[in-house]
A protein has these predicted regions:
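A structural/positional concept
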Residues: 2-35
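Cysteine protease-like catalytic core of ubiquitin/ubiquitin-like
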Residues: 9-13, 34-255, 263-279
């Protein structure tokens, strides 16, 4: 179960920074589409555990590594695993894992990124030994201190957002959509660096239109898959308040109220909007 706040849906409809619960919804919807369309050789990992605020303890990091290891082993015939990673509630980087090649490529949309990837690097690296132990194959194994690890490329070429923009998550979804689209049409080449360099040459007007398409797709997912009883993501029961509170705690989203009431009895739904020029 995912608990979505109306505040966050309101943010999405106004192209404000996206909360990670919405990215999880989008990712699960895309993965179902990949399965339905039989898009070859690619998996989107459920990003439930891939959030810095959830990875605070060694035990939590081990749970995340074990989960990722299980996903990779369950899809041993696949080469490409897409992992949305959240350094905080609204800042997201897409990581493309290729376990057989021991490669982890970070599609970081910041032009001068200062993100600390230490924690997620350890989580990813700790998933590889189990993959190797239980029959995972490598075409290019990398070992450090006798242990299988990834080569982490945190400066991989990708579309960059303008200075001051807070739309990391939209860019992560743009990269996700591009990878899945080209993989579906079998245009994703083995030379991923060359492919990504060509992708990064997108024009400003095109990226603006892409953000609007992502916004529209969010609306379609909610309207077609979440709300109707026939939807693939419809929850066929009414959760109790305690179940909602438990889910909020599990998804590390229990540190804020649903809505903040202003003195004039209105509601604060979203932050001050960014300049319309910052996409």
């Amino acid at each position: 179960m995912i608990v979505l706040r109306f505040d966050d849906i309101f943010d999405m409809l106004n192209l404000y920074p996206l909360h990670y619960t919405l990215i999880r919804l989008f990712s699960l919807s895309m993965e179902m589409r990949i399965i339905r369309d039989k898009t070859p050789d690619i998996v989107i990992v459920d990003p439930f555990y891939m959030c810095a605020k959830i990875l605070g303890s060694a035990r939590d990091r081990q749970v995340a590594s074990s989960y990722l290891e299980g996903v990779i082993l369950a899809n041993a015939d696949k080469d490409n695993f897409l992992v949305p990673y959240f350094s905080d509630d609204t800042h997201c980087t897409l990581i493309l894992l290729r376990p057989k090649y021991s490669m982890a490529m970070y599609f970081d949309s910041d032009r001068q990124s200062k993100k600390d990837y230490t924690t997620i690097k350890k989580v990813l690296d700790d998933a590889l030994p189990g993959y190797a132990k239980y029959g995972g194959t490598f075409r290019r194994p990398i070992r450090r201190y006798g242990k299988h690890v990834f080569t982490h490329v945190t400066t991989f070429p990708c579309v960059k957002k303008p200075p001051g923009s807070q739309k990391d998550a939209y860019y992560a979804l743009h990269h996700t959509r591009a990878i899945v689209r080209d993989q579906h049409h079998r245009m994703l080449t083995n030379d991923l660096k060359e492919w990504a360099t060509c992708l990064s040459a997108i024009q400003d007007e095109d990226i603006r239109q892409e953000l609007f398409r992502i916004q529209s797709e969010f609306a379609e997912i909610i309207y077609q898959d979440v709300l109707p009883s026939s939807g693939q993501l419809y929850l066929n029961c009414q959760p109790s308040n305690s179940e909602i509170e438990t889910t909020l705690q599990m998804q590390a989203d229990n540190d804020r109220t649903f809505m903040t009431i202003r003195k004039d009895d209105g509601f604060i739904h979203a932050p001050v909007p960014e300049s319309s020029q910052k996409y």
